[in-house]
């Protein structure tokens, strides 16, 4: 299984990034290959000028096309997800998430931002034809405490449990996801099949 994780925060230190990293570790511990992207890893000019021919953008598009699922994490600013994330998602082809499972993760200053996932992020994922967008996770800033120095960030126990449950649901959804059959393979199967009437 291949999962692409996308971090929508332009900041190197972000709570959504903490949850994305925990998700990556959890999935890798279960044998899932995870390739991580952060919006800040892309040249700003590529995002702002929609450079579809950029080597980094093309590499991103190829890995998304190969992925079984995506984990998309974003901070919530002014009742919506990060604008930098939107510019990156806009560089994907129209049906880029077809046959893919998506787990959205969002963080915000208060619980009042929780609906941003449903009313802002999920419609964009739907427009990209995600096969299934899971309920996802929202965490307010008080549930994630940055670690001092090299110490890891601490999650509130309730958040830790919700993250684990959501990742378990995501993992199960990936496992049961039907795999599209390439036209050439399908033709071979039809030719070699035994038919009876």
Curated annotation (Swiss-Prot):
Keyword Flavoprotein attached: yes
Keywords tagged on the record: Flavoprotein, FMN, NADP, Oxidoreductase
Reaction catalysed by this enzyme: FMNH2 + NADP(+) = FMN + NADPH + 2 H(+)
Gene3D superfamilies membership: 3.40.50.360
EC number: 1.5.1.38
Gene Ontology molecular function: FMN reductase (NADPH) activity; FMN reductase [NAD(P)H] activity; oxidoreductase activity, acting on NAD(P)H, quinone or similar compound as acceptor
InterPro entries tied to this protein: Flavoprotein-like_sf, FMN_Rdtase-like_dom, NAD(P)H-dep_FMN_reductase, NADPH-dep_FMN_reduc_SsuE
Domain of life according to the entry: Bacteria
NCBIfam families: FMN_reduc_SsuE, PRK10569.1
Record's function text: Probably forms a two-component reduced flavin mononucleotide-dependent monooxygenase by binding to SsuD. Required for growth on aliphatic sulfonates or methionine but not arylsulfonates.
Protein's recorded name: FMN reductase (NADPH)
Lineage: Bacteria, Pseudomonadati, Pseudomonadota, Gammaproteobacteria, Pseudomonadales
């Amino acid at each position: 299984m291949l999962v692409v994780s996308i971090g929508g925060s332009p900041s190197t230190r972000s709570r959504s990034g903490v949850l994305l990293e925990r998700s990556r570790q959890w999935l890798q511990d279960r044998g899932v290959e995870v390739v991580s992207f952060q919006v800040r890893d892309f040249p700003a000019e590529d995002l702002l000028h929609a450079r579809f021919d950029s080597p980094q953008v093309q590499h991103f598009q190829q890995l998304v096309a190969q992925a079984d699922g995506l984990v998309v994490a974003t901070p919530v600013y002014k009742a919506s997800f990060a604008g930098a994330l939107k510019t990156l998602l806009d560089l994907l082809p129209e049906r880029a998430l077809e046959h893919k499972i998506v787990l959205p993760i969002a963080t915000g200053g208060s619980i009042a931002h929780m609906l941003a996932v449903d009313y802002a992020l999920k419609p964009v994922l739907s427009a990209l034809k995600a096969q299934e967008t899971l309920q996802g996770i929202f965490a307010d800033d008080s549930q994630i405490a940055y670690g001092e120095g090299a110490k890891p960030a601490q999650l509130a126990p309730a958040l830790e449990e919700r993250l684990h449950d959501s990742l378990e649901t995501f993992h199960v959804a990936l496992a049961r996801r039907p795999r599209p059959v390439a036209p050439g393979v399908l033709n071979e199967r039809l030719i070699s099949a035994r038919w009876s009437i």
